[in-house]
Each structure stands twice: as structure tokens, then as C-alpha cells.
Swiss-Prot record:
InterPro entries: Actin, ATPase_NBD
Superkingdom of the source species: Eukaryota
A Pfam family recorded for this sequence: Actin
Origin organism lineage: Eukaryota, Metazoa, Chordata, Craniata, Vertebrata
Role according to the record: May play a role in the suppression of metastatic potential in lung adenoma carcinoma cells.
Protein's gene: ACTR3C
GO molecular function: actin binding; ATP binding
PANTHER family in alphabetical order: ACTIN (PTHR11937)
Protein name as annotated: Actin-related protein 3C
């Protein structure tokens, strides 16, 4: 690589450390540090990764089987229950698009329900899709799904009655498993960059996050 492409230099870094550095661009992050908890959520699994002074504490990493795919399935289920007129063969694709475009994490689910009930015109969005068979447009209202989808991280029982361990519990467990001298800094600087999905509202979370 260096000889063929004349690359002047190369720096290899751990993704979790880079995620912490990237979180510095958020207004919610006060102090710039490479100590914190990184939640790396992909399509099928979510990892909780403790980082202390730029070093990943590998022995304390935990994972949970809730990730982006589960949010999509849950939103799909919510839309089906409302019978909003989505073509059946496009329900999964529509749920994924709604997740990536409209979903966000809320600090208080009860207050969020109240917001939508008091002023639905302000919070309910409309999604427009094209029926793949007849090429006609279909429009659906997107309401509670906007925050209920990501809420399964904190209330996994919403999507699966057998899943009882929330992301909050896992984060606390990960920190408690870390060396005692880094626990306080981890709790203090708990910044959680969600790497998936890259939709509106998926910003670093600061404590208390649920």
C-alpha cells in the first residue's frame, strides 16, 4: 500500500474510541474525553463497550440480542395493528424507512405520549410510499411509532416478553464489572453514541438516560 499508492502514513484505531471522539461534536457533550460507554448497535446485535482513557476494556464488553432489525420488526408490527393500508409486501421496507427517517429516543415515554395527545398535528408525521404493483401513492400517519420503536432498547418486553434485560441494566452491569478505579469516571462521562440507525434523534445520550 505504501509503495504502490504512496500513502504517507496510516493510523489504525478502535471503532469504539472513534465513536467517543465523534461524540465531541454533539452539544450534549461538555468535556472532551476518551472515557465512556459506547453502545455499538448494528442490524442484529448490540455491544456495550467500556472505554477508559482511549483503551477498550475488552473483558467487560457485553452484548444484547436487540438491534436495528428488532426496531424495524417492532415498527412493522405496530403499523400492522393499526391497519394503515401499507401493501403487505412492502411493510418491512416501509417500517425500515420510517425508522431511519422519523424515529428518535425520548427521555420520558409517558410525557412523550402526552405530547402527541395534546398536539398531534405538531408531532405526527406523514410517510408517502409508492405501491410497487400499481405504482399508486399511499400515505400513512406516523405517530407513536416514532419513539416506541427505539424504546425497545429500554423496554425490551415491548417487542419480546422473554427479553427482560434493558440496555440501561446492561450498561450498569458493564460498568460494575470494570476495575473499580474507572467506574466513577465511566458513570460521570457516560456518553452513548448509537451507531445504528443513522436517523433523526439518534444522538449521544447523557445520564440519566432511562
Amino acid at each position: 500500500m505504501f509503495e504502490s499508492f504512496n500513502v504517507p502514513g496510516l493510523y489504525i484505531a478502535v471503532q469504539a474510541v472513534l465513536a467517543l471522539a465523534a461524540s465531541w461534536t454533539s452539544r450534549q457533550v461538555g468535556e472532551r474525553t476518551l472515557t465512556g460507554i459506547v453502545i455499538d448497535s448494528g442490524d442484529g446485535v448490540t455491544h456495550v463497550i467500556p472505554v477508559a482513557e482511549g483503551y477498550v476494556i475488552g473483558s467487560c464488553i457485553k452484548h444484547i440480542p436487540i438491534a436495528g432489525r428488532d426496531i424495524t420488526y417492532f415498527i412493522q408490527q405496530l403499523l400492522r395493528e393499526r391497519e394503515v393500508g401499507i401493501p403487505p409486501e412492502q411493510s418491512l421496507e416501509t417500517a425500515k424507512a420510517i425508522k431511519e427517517k422519523y424515529c428518535y429516543i425520548c427521555p420520558d415515554i409517558v410525557k412523550e405520549f402526552a405530547k402527541y395527545d395534546v398536539d398531534p398535528q405538531k408531532w405526527i408525521k406523514q410517510y408517502t410510499g409508492i405501491n410497487a404493483i400499481n405504482q399508486k401513492k399511499f400515505v400513512i400517519d406516523v405517530g407513536y411509532e416514532r419513539f416506541l420503536g427505539p424504546e425497545i432498547f429500554f423496554h425490551p418486553e415491548f417487542a419480546n416478553p422473554d427479553s427482560m434485560e434493558s440496555i440501561s441494566d446492561v450498561v450498569d452491569e458493564v460498568i460494575q464489572n470494570c476495575p473499580i478505579d474507572v467506574r466513577r469516571p465511566l458513570y460521570k462521562m457516560e456518553q452513548i453514541p448509537l451507531s445504528y440507525p443513522q436517523g433523526h434523534g439518534f444522538h449521544p445520550l447523557s445520564p440519566p438516560f432511562h
